[in-house]
Amino acid sequence: MKVWKSTICALLLVILLTPCAMAAAAPAPGLTCAPDNRGNLISLQEVGGEYLLFLPSTADLTALTLNFEGEPAALTAGGREIAVTSGQPFDLTALYPGGPDDGVYAFTFRAGSGQTPVKLMVSENIGSMFITSADPVNKGRSYVEQVKGNKASGRMTLIGADGGLIYSGELSQIKGRGNSTWTAYPKKPYQIKLGKKTDLLQTGDPGEAAKTWVLLANYYDKSFILNTLTFDLADALGLPYSPNSRPIDLYYDGEYRGTYLLCEKTEINGGRVDIHDLEGDFEDANPEVEDFDDLPTARGTNAWGNEYQYVTGLSDPDDISGGYLLEIDYSGRAAAEKSWFTTSRGYSLVSKSPEYLSENAMEYISGLYQEFEDAVWNGGVNPTTGKSYTDYMDLESLARCYLILELSQDGDAFFSSTFFYKPQGEDKLYAGPVWDFDSAYGGNYLHFNDTAIVAGATYIGRKLLAIPSFGEAVEQIYENELNRLVTDIVLNADPEAQSGRLRSVAGYIAEVSASQRMNNVLWSVGGPGVLTDASESLRNFISRRNEYLCELDFSQLPDDVFWYLDVPQNIWYYSAVRYVTEKGLFSGITDNIFMPDEVMTRAMVATVLYRQAGSPKVEGPSPFSDVPENQWYSDAVAWAADIGVADGYSDGRFDPGREITRQELVTMLYRYAAYTGADMTAQEIPEKYLDRDSVSDWAVDAFAWAVDRGIIDGTSPSELSPRGNALRYMAAAIFQRYDETLG
């Protein structure tokens, strides 16, 4: 994908959206406006070998302007032709008396003896944002996207879906944002800072005006509505400060960049998390500090012996009781922040605001959260203070936040992007705002079972559900509020169904469908039906999920609901995974994640066999240079090498992390069976397996034995796939059969 800069016919083709066409009032018939400092240029872009123009919903196709070098040109389509002159408006619709073909205006631009096929697409229903870099050559989009910390400035214009001007002025900063969305995907999310506070979402509330906003790429979300839907559902459920958002078409230095979600940033500020700004108090208490980023950090431990990091050299304001905004995050990410602390259960929380905490403030907030965690782990009562967990955390917000995380099946629940805030002068924390749902609702890469408890099976969730008062609160809110919102609004087939901010899935999809179609062409996301499929899949998921949760008694959940989230009970290998787990042969990647599709490694297989043998005592250090002591696999690898189940390499390595094939797994199991004295005679591999000759010579006996004993079967009725990866679910089935047959 690149901006087209061909010199064919000396063409420089751009669509000029004239300022009059974008004014709040519709232009008078026949009126055109000369470009001025509100004109926005959109470049022709090459995508997949085709040239495309992506226009915003406010584009007037009866008064488009092409700018190009050279003599007047012509546009042709369907045997029709219209003349165009650079800088002069023309009526594109004259080429299409019957309308465009499937929403795409395909024409040929002819100039002199050259011609260029062009496809033009137009958005609908949503606004558009135009970002123009102050220095596009040195600090344009490519510079901003090189490193997340790179910052640039420029101007920004935001046009509403109705053509009204919402903002046109200074963009004091644009930079990258996000974690996996920044590193893993080509479509980058941004944070922008305006020159003045503005209510970009036009809520009508002056308190919603702000300088800082985020642009979420939602690259992983095929429907593009998951974040908006969830934010609005949380708002309807009564969670304060749930982010407001709106989809827009983004143009950056003349290039269309796709559908983005213009969203409020999760921060302490008016119109956001509207509590006292303790960060401002720290700034007032330290007037000599010019740049807080320059202050050094130090680490310490609180009264519970848990590590934290704080900023040194800060004077405390008079009151450090709030407000705080905390986020549970992965330890690796937390360590990159200025102020964070760990809990007694090994989890990390970052102070998002204040970003720079003194040691006293860190002691205070980390201690408050730790007392809450201790209370939850002790059945709801802190064993030292005697206080209830609800003395430390607001029950209503915690129960409502939990339900949003659970209904959406958010894989980050209580691991990352889970926020708490604490107002000044209050004794307790509050849960929220909710955040980051672009891979929720069945879209998580772990492929959770639809009927699995997710938020309630992670970190603090499971302990909370063991407390009767929490389960009862969740049950009441679901039965009396959330179920009604889901049934009456979210799943309503009417696109007009709405309650406050919350709309139906059909309504959200209708709003964004034309823009998302352009986005999918730009980013090569699926085919023409991808949005329809995503919409139907989402509705079906929410319907199934709601039905399942409605049947649960949250105050008395059975143990089965806490099974591996990614191993559905209706899948064929469920019984095998359950068998090897209960036998102690396998364990999950985490307490509730099995990752059945992950490939087994040499260390994993050695460990399973070691457990099969009863985990015998191992004397002496590992014989391999790459197997240090005190690793989870150290004893298993040393044992496996000692009895001849697994060999090392000539250079002294074992390579514990190397992924193995099906024939390698079977060979290790075959050697173990021989070690135990089992009968190793076997028939040849049956001829029905057409790929039996692809079994390596060194693995033929092992495969023949495993097939003969019924320990392994084919990946299809006619294929053994000996050189295919040995996945965890396959290995679970193999070891179950072995244990039942020979164990």
Residue ranges and their predicted role:
Residues 196-199, 210, 217, 238-243, ...:
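Internal "kinase-insert"/substrate-recognition segments embedded within catalytic cores
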Residues 157-217, 358:
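Conserved oxyanion/phosphate-binding beta-strand-loop segments in alpha/beta enzyme cores
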Residues 181, 334-338, 344-415, 421-562:
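Middle-to-C-terminal accessory/interaction subdomains
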Residues 73-75, 237-249, 410, 588, ...:
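Short, well-structured beta-strand/strand-turn elements
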Residues 169-175, 555-574, 582-583, 587-636, ...:
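Feature responds to low-complexity, polar/acidic, surface-exposed segments characteristic
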Residues 98-104, 115-167:
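N-terminal module-boundary/linker segments of secreted carbohydrate-active enzymes
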Residues 24-105, 113-118:
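Predominantly extracytoplasmic/ectodomain segments of secreted and cell-surface proteins
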Residues 9-19:
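Bacterial N-terminal signal peptides
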